[in-house]
Amino acid sequence: MTDIQNKNYIIALDQGTTSSRAIIFDRDANVVCTAQREFAQHYPQAGWVEHDPMEIFATQSAVMVEALAQAGLHHDQVAAIGITNQRETTVVWDKNTGRPIYNAIVWQCRRSTEICQQLKRDGLEDYIRETTGLVTDPYFSGTKLKWILDNVEGSRERARNGELLFGTIDSWLIWKFTGGKTHVTDYTNASRTMLFNIHTLEWDAKMLEVLDIPREMLPEVKSSSEIYGRTKSGIAIGGIAGDQQAALFGQMCVEPGQAKNTYGTGCFLLMNTGDKAVKSQHGMLTTIACGPSGEVAYALEGAVFNGGSTVQWLRDELKIINDAHDTEYFAGKVKDSNGVYLVPAFTGLGAPYWDPYARGALFGLTRGVRVDHIIRAALESIAYQTRDVLDAMQQDSGERLKALRVDGGAVANNFLMQFQADILGTQVERPQMRETTALGAAYLAGLACGFWGSLEELRGKAVIEREFEPQLAEAEKEGLYAGWKKAVSRTRDWEPHDEAK
């Protein structure tokens, strides 16, 4: 480890759903340089989404080379690589040629819906929830992998003979970067496959049997922070975490009760529950996160379907704003929403309601309502939905929320951040560093190779740019929230369907 002093940089590879990025960090965890390339999305049928794994690897290697060149660095100056990735996306490749036998099936792809329905008919929902922490949904890797083995001729037999390998995107990239020497994944990615027992920390024999998946094709599961292998040019690969778990670590949410919300198109909330794998009563996922040194910790995860997309709707469909950034100005022009609530259930409601038949609605309209009130109500809806999820997580875990760390595009909106603190009655902390996902991967790699000595050293680098303190009186806060709950109840079960009462 002696030469680590001469290596002053860490590279984070952030392999996302639409682009591959490389971000170089220095010893102070500042961004030195970033490179990014988009790649093609393939939609062979309605509801199907695929990526070309070779293109993912090509763009990911290209941006790494590009970032080094841009920063004027040689690979000898890099201490380690950390990888963070779009989760659940499924790749199967030939061990000898290193080529995929089918395109990657992406997390958004719904083609394995029928396989999930069969699992439900077979009464496996409770077993899946207990063992893997997940709901029975095409979102997760297991049913995607079964689909490939069912539909690519001879593939199951070849997998049994040890000729084919399965991996999520992290595994695929590491296999390619190490020239086929290393077939691994980490606990956070394994916990998204629906094939992994999150309590024993082993591949689950019953799930493999039910989905008819040969054990031979699965990667070895390791911690999120250790040296897994080296690239052909000799750089150590030292950190792996799925994107949401990497963001949780990048935000330094390593103690029970610490939570982060990523405000994107939807919102992704994760709350650390320490060494307790909490079974949710509210439809949250129980998932594996990173403990203080990349070891296994548990978290609850909940998703809000419509966050930033609600603001896009104001802009693109209603055309009442020109730019998402304008919402802060309009929301601040009025003292409140004038009794208006917008429930953005455009695609149903996610956690904790799980109602696919709910539809969006505006409530409380009177003649005094102006566009400003509607814009304000749209921003408020993002904060209300976040509270819905965090209240459920606190009930499930028995942990009190200490503070909410935030990242993602919408955190630049000061009105939204202040209202979020107000409606939660909890401090909201916005970090200076917005690249929290890549930072998490860099931290994990840096800890593995001794680039950074300890968690305490990293905590010193987590600069909070602004803290938003709650300013609403308790009675006012609860009055507003009661109005939201009433509005949500009126949107439920709107769309006609077979199971309707």
Curated annotation (Swiss-Prot):
Signal peptide residues on this chain, from the entry's feature table = none
Modulation of this protein's activity: Inhibited by fructose 1,6-bisphosphate (FBP).
| Similarity comment | Belongs to the FGGY kinase family.
Biological function: Key enzyme in the regulation of glycerol uptake and metabolism. Catalyzes the phosphorylation of glycerol to yield sn-glycerol 3-phosphate.
Annotated residues that bind ATP are located at T17, T18, S19, T265, G308, Q312, G409
Q: Which GO terms describe its biological process?
A: glycerol catabolic process; glycerol metabolic process; glycerol-3-phosphate metabolic process
Q: Name one GO cellular component term.
A: cytosol
Cross-referenced HAMAP family, in alphabetical order?
Glycerol_kin
**InterPro entries in the record:** ATPase_NBD, Carb_kinase_FGGY, Carb_kinase_FGGY_CS, FGGY_C, FGGY_N, Glycerol_kin
Specify the pathway: Polyol metabolism; glycerol degradation via glycerol kinase pathway; sn-glycerol 3-phosphate from glycerol: step 1/1
For this protein, the record's PANTHER family field holds:
GLYCEROL KINASE, SUGAR KINASE
Q: Recorded E.C. number(s)?
A: 2.7.1.30
Supply the source organism for this entry.
Pseudomonas fluorescens (strain ATCC BAA-477 / NRRL B-23932 / Pf-5)
Q: What is this protein called?
A: Glycerol kinase
Instruction: Give binding positions for glycerol.
Output: R87, E88, Y139, D243, Q244
The family database entries (NCBIfam families) matched by this protein are listed as: glycerol_kin, PRK00047.1
Gene name in the database record: glpK
Please provide the record's keywords in A-Z order.
ATP-binding, Glycerol metabolism, Kinase, Nucleotide-binding, Transferase
Picking any one GO molecular function of the record gives: ATP binding
Which of this chain's residues are annotated to bind ADP?
A: T17, R21, T265, G308, G409, N413
Q: Which of this chain's residues are annotated to bind sn-glycerol 3-phosphate? A: T17, R87, E88, Y139, D243
Q: Which CDD domains match?
A: FGGY_EcGK_like
Catalysed reaction per UniProt?
A: glycerol + ATP = sn-glycerol 3-phosphate + ADP + H(+)
